[in-house]
Amino acid sequence: MMSPTPEDDRDLVVVRGRLRMMDNGAEHDRERRSYTAWPHLCCGCTIGIILTMFVIATTLLLASLFAFSYMSLESGTCPKEWIGLGYSCMRVAGNNATELEALDMCAQHNSKLVDFTNAKTLVEAIVPFGSTNASFGNIFRLRDSRSTCILPTIGGPISVDCPRTCSVVCQRPRPLSTAASIIRDARIYLRLERRDYYEVYSSILSNAIMK
């Protein structure tokens, strides 16, 4: 067998160098792919975290809308010139008013005429501050009846026939806090609750407490 000539050695070196260059290029490609994969991985993780937080927030919001009772978030403070009684606020709106005038007076204050239970409790509360006469107060109308009114006396409230004009006592629910108002408005917007639900519910709770 003939020994390799110098020309053959040069060819072999070139081939070996070319192979080494090819190996180095493959390693460089792998490193470049690994470097570009990290940003995509981080971006995917960030999007996944954001979506998870969005799902959790949506779940909590829906749970609060469907299951949370916002009655526990009421402020408990009646507006100025209103008297707090149970879950309701009351105010004397005027005197010598007809039925239509009484309804209009309460509507101007975003309220309604006082109901019988609150009227009875209010009269019993002011009796100790009345005079010794059999009758010391003005007759005022009730929400529950168009023909029967309440007359405060030292012995307590009594029912009388409504005259043409009476005093006007208005009633409205205690105000809600900001968070409770947002929940209530959302329920009303989604038609999960009637607009007058809070007023009716607060009146029921107030009457239950006073009985």
Swiss-Prot record:
It comes from the Viruses. The chain crosses the membrane at residues 47-67. The keyword Transmembrane applies. Signal peptide: none annotated. Coiled coil: none annotated. It is a single-pass type II membrane protein. Residues 68-211 are virion surface. Keywords: Glycoprotein, Membrane, Signal-anchor, Transmembrane, Transmembrane helix, Viral envelope protein, Virion. Belongs to the herpesviridae HHV-1 UL45 family. Residues 1-46 are intravirion. GO terms for cellular component: membrane; viral envelope; virion membrane. This is Envelope protein UL45 homolog. The gene is UL45H. InterPro entries: CTDL_fold. Glycans are attached at residues 96, 133. It is found in: Virion membrane.
